[in-house]
Amino acid sequence: MKKFQLLFFLFLFSYSVFAQWQVRDSSLFNPHVTVGYGYSTPGGDLANRFGNNGSIEVGFNVKSKKNWYYGVQFNYLFGNRVHEPNLLSNLLTDRGEILDEDGQIATMFIQERGFNVFLQGGKVLPIIGPNKNSGLLITAGVGLLQHKIRLEHQEAKITQLEGEYLKGYDRLTNGLSVHQFIGYYHLSNNRLINFYIGAQATEGFTQSRREWNLDTQTQDTDKRLDMLFGLRAGWILNLYQRAPNDFYIY
């Protein structure tokens, strides 16, 4: 029994040493999933409508043996600061309240919601970090940015904010976007601590997708420049290829 335990320990030790040597001394082909969080400040026209926002991020990316980096990223945007002038002004009473169908004062939650999805490409420059697979990560991308105002009135029923009427207030906006990221990409030698962190900028060339704003009784046809500047950080879930058709997640 003791011999078996000794052999098992030696096997695990040799496996760990080999794995660390493989990451430390060679540049790996590395497909991986990323999961992270971002926090951004708006700029341009977006700053006139929303405040700072957070984002939950998920992506699938590949780092080649030559450290080229490419993939697809999806970010879900959310925030609680909305400063759209005159929003719901046509529904307010003289006291500045909104009433539901029963004539009761309705509690409203007005929030930002949106997403951006994009393809990205760039390179890992191994000038810092513990191995050839870590370093300065620089990427650029192109995709779609979308945002709108979320109007939540919970259990209260407000006919003017139901169905097609709601579209007259939500300011749904989207369009082409471009993205830039610079940060640090880290794959540890023991494969246990893998992460990214850095700064990102987004520029969206957007416009309203609603035909009519009911509160202002106007049509919004303006071209917009929506910008986001912020920080991102997240975890890297690696998919290493060990043998033909076999993949392992770390």
Predicted regions and their residues:
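Residues on the lipid-exposed face of transmembrane beta-strands in outer-membrane beta-barrel proteins
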Residues: 35, 58-62, 74-76, 117-123, ...
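Short loop/turn motifs that connect adjacent beta-strands in outer-membrane beta-barrel proteins
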Residues: 20-30, 66-67, 126-135, 187-195, ...
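Structural signature of outer-membrane beta-barrel domains
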Residues: 40-42, 77-81, 124-126, 143-149, ...
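Short glycine/proline- and aromatic-enriched beta-strand/turn motifs that initiate or cap beta-hairpins
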Residues: 20-69, 234, 238, 250
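Residues that define the transmembrane beta-barrel architecture of outer-membrane proteins
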Residues: 29, 52-56, 111-117, 134, ...
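Predominantly the C-terminal beta-signal and adjacent terminal strand-loop region
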Residues: 180, 186-250
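N-terminal signal peptide c-region/cleavage motif recognized by signal peptidases
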Residues: 14-17
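Extracellular/periplasm-exposed beta-strand and loop segments of Gram-negative cell-envelope proteins
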Residues: 44-49, 81-113, 147-175, 206-214, ...
